[in-house]
């Protein structure tokens, strides 16, 4: 890993980072290929399997680059970064037996992420937000195509408004998960949730309370949309894997630091 930070002014910095690492596929799925005989006493005897010595686990080399800028003011704090990562191989899932293979197709993920917080002068109000917009692609036959939605991540954005008159701290935030599609025509549907988070400082300790999914949005989680693509119809109807997100959820907590 290597990085450099330049102080443009007292309140502004820019940076560049480079890192190189190795991503390993799931060993259980990579080596989980075998032939089994007839059941004996309720167990299936393993007849043959992948020889680990003859099939070493292939590492995927990942190079990552990031260029960013930040500003820290009295009332405004913001930062912006662009990133780009490349991989020399790609993981592919066999949806018949759920094993995986490592292919020589290259992969790249790139995007822009940022955040901003603004504290309104002479008031207890503040606003802010953050976002991460990205694309994930694999190179197939010399052409870059969208990566499989069962592996790629969707773009996200969050916006919030806060009010913090001492000893209260209240915040309402909205998170948007955007649609995602791949080269095979599969699609994940985005959704929006709103949360309310608050706290009250007591003479001894602090009470924290929350209402997640304040508007009781009916949605299917990202995993709940990926799972049917992975497991259905081989392992049953898609309805078995459509995991819904939690509805309106209340939380209450008391904490004491000593």
Task: Give, region by region, the residue ranges found by the protein language model.
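Structural signature of outer-membrane beta-barrel channels/translocons
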Residues: 5-7, 60, 70-74, 85, ...
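Hydrophobic, lipid-facing positions within transmembrane beta-strands of outer-membrane proteins
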Residues: 1-4, 53, 63-67, 78, ...
């Amino acid at each position: 890993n290597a990085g450099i930070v330049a102080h443009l002014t007292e309140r502004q910095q820019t940076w560049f980072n480079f890192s190189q690492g190795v991503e390993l596929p799931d060993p259980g799925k990579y080596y989980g290929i075998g032939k089994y005989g007839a059941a004996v006493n309720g167990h299936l005897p393993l007849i043959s399997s992948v020889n680990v010595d003859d099939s070493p686990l292939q590492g995927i080399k990942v190079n990552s680059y990031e260029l960013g800028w930040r500003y820290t003011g009295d009332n405004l704090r913001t930062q912006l970064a662009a990133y780009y990562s490349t991989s020399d191989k790609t993981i592919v899932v066999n949806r018949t037996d759920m094993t995986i293979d490592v292919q020589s197709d290259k992969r790249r993920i790139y995007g822009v992420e940022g955040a901003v917080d603004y504290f309104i002068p002479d008031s207890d109000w503040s606003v802010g937000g953050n976002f991460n917009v990205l694309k994930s692609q694999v190179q197939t036959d010399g052409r870059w195509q969208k990566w499989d939605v069962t592996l790629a991540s969707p773009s996200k954005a969050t916006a919030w408004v806060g009010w913090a008159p001492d000893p209260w701290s209240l915040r309402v935030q909205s998170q948007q998960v955007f649609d995602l599609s791949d080269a095979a025509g599969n699609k994940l549907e985005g959704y929006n949730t709103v949360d309310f988070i608050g706290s009250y400082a007591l003479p001894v300790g602090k009470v924290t309370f929350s209402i997640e999914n304040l508007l009781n949005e009916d949605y299917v989680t990202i995993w709940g949309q990926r799972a049917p693509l992975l497991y259905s119809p081989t392992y049953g109807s898609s309805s078995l894997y459509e995991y819904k997100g939690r509805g309106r959820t209340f939380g209450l907590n008391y904490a004491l630091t000593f």
